[in-house]
């Protein structure tokens, strides 16, 4: 290499040293000083890993005094370069010797890095291109936000998330029956809103007992890192911000925290995008006296654009309570309870028409007339004719029915704000089997009852009944708090025998009181050494989590988990299928809540319900009322609260007095009323709302699309190559699992999301669902997203040189492959990525500037290429400079033409989708007042914004590869 003092060179292996200056040439050695770092390097003149830095006309360069020059002419004098051009600030014609160039110069543009000899390995160029394709594929996916969560692909859950998650500032009521997965639906919506940029700041309000469970669920299932806020956390946060809620984007807190005026004011001022309220049916409301909890949520809902309320079903709540929730979502729309009742009555015609369509049978003249009247603004005669035509294709007829159902759904009063699935409309639940185990009443309890009756005459009936349902509690109170009752209670003997007989089975035991649960654990431990753990409201959240994890362990874990009534709220243990009810709650909803701990979506076995009770006592009579009157053990009973309210007086008297005649009368009356309510509910079932909530065939197709994405071999290959390039150690763990560890040779100093001690991952959804300790990898997982960002935001793979061995082409033939990114700068919330995400534009030029990319695919071209030593690659680039410079300008012309096409297609797609949706919503607003003005104005504003962003779309060269033909 010809070296001269003062020349500027850059190190091919240590580009971070900046621009070097030749300060010594002696014999076969050359000394280069790198002024930016003050370091010297000594190189062999013949094999120095150095590249001469020479700029070209049009380049902008910077002097060591930090003024810039646009180069117009390059002069070589005495082996040194002098640049002539225009001063960027003054416009004067100036000259700059290369010795006076800025030392801190870095080559960021791919073409600059190529000519400066900063050439990457061939595999890195390939991985970079695959990363850009993956990012584009994810951004344009219709399933964005649904693929990543570690949840089962259950149709109604995915459907609700798909429908609600795509809305701007959704305000909906999720009112599925117990066990159908409202928390998962909310998590899916949150995940989708965050990933699509529709929301950034989210507040989740839950009962105090569920805060940690939500925290764990959001992280384990959705990879979302929420922060739990309590008073202590708020005080700590003052060091960072006057408003503690601004210190985190994703926050979970309890209503109790917000009861303090100061904290509520801070929450109101925190600019949330979405609020989620769990157990919203506990928010008590009446027109005269709404509760404090209701007022807190109401104040927040007036400030926060998006609101999700998770609540019990309207059937369980009663109409006024249901109206109160809807009022939180849209107070202008749901302003008067009587008007709401009247409006609901008018939906019966819509529901009747929907029943006719959903039945799949031929439509009667009455049904056709009803449909025609309801959909009077459009001509449906062709669709009706098609449905009635038995000779028509089955799929075509089904499509016609579906379209008419969709039209009816759009006109349904609460169809856009209420989602309610019931077990009647969702399949896949296990059988529930009741096993009763009557036990003889011990004498100790008989005595305790007698004494209690004499001493507690002042108590009201309700309090007396609660006492007689828990004889162990009465005995403890009279025995100075001693817990010795378990030594003679026959229910405990039965429980021990049951656990010994079923040692291999996990058993959940629920009792009303925490004291009872603790005593039972002591009994099992001291009498038989049975491994059991307790779960009650006196334990901290972390203690409860540990107890739950101990119970869940297959090997070495507890056989039994003993829960108190309050302690078990919100916890699910569907890996167990045996439930022991040590006593019974005096409330049908609480009974269902107990059974619902096991009877949930995901339960793979029948739920066996065991009920040991004391014969000829209030326990037996309550068992009979629940079983014979309500059928509440083996089926869900939505009318349970109604029946309890209607018969509570008679029930309480019957429980206190052992009167067989009264009991028979009560059972007969309850059973008759139960059948009456069941029939009324069946007839009044809102089939249209059910169709909208579970999605029908559309939900099944959605789930099938998601299932097809699972195990995508192309994705798996791309992700594994990505981890290889970054330097992540991958150890096969068997059973479709891989253990990832940071290696000593990581390309980047940190890889966010990859723990130092490693993480076990799988691409198999079923495995991830069966193992809490294994992460599910999809293209939405943070480990994949972070990996893509690390590569695409760095210079990795932006340049490469390769050899094409093909004797059909003349040796020395040159090809220049350029990867541009077509993009437009816009905030994520604008949703521009749906129409013009960063899109790779490939241009492949021969030496004459002909674009061959349409005829030669990337894959076929790449397979024929071989890597080149970096030193040789640098020489090849230098030798080809004269040919390459004009090709860059030519390539940009081709890429710009493609950009215009992409922008036009994006604009057409955006206009078609959004204007179509806008017109549809405007038309529907005339027949369905649930269409909010905010949705219409947001769509109009979004279209204007997107057009502006598309006007500013641009190209950026992302990577370049020089390819030379060789016959060697």
UniProtKB/Swiss-Prot annotation:
Taxonomic superkingdom: Bacteria
UniProt enzyme class: hydrolase
Record protein name field: RNA polymerase-associated protein RapA
Recorded family membership: Belongs to the SNF2/RAD54 helicase family. RapA subfamily.
UniProtKB keywords: Activator, ATP-binding, DNA-binding, Helicase, Hydrolase, Nucleotide-binding, Transcription, Transcription regulation
The protein's role, per its UniProt record: Transcription regulator that activates transcription by stimulating RNA polymerase (RNAP) recycling in case of stress conditions such as supercoiled DNA or high salt concentrations. Probably acts by releasing the RNAP, when it is trapped or immobilized on tightly supercoiled DNA. Does not activate transcription on linear DNA. Probably not involved in DNA repair.
Pfam families named among the record's database cross-references: Helicase_C, RapA_C, SNF2-rel_dom, Tudor_1_RapA, Tudor_RapA
Residue ranges constituting the Helicase C-terminal domain according to the UniProt record: 491-678
Family matches, as PROSITE patterns: HELICASE_ATP_BIND_1, HELICASE_CTER
Helicase ATP-binding domain ranges (all copies): 163-332
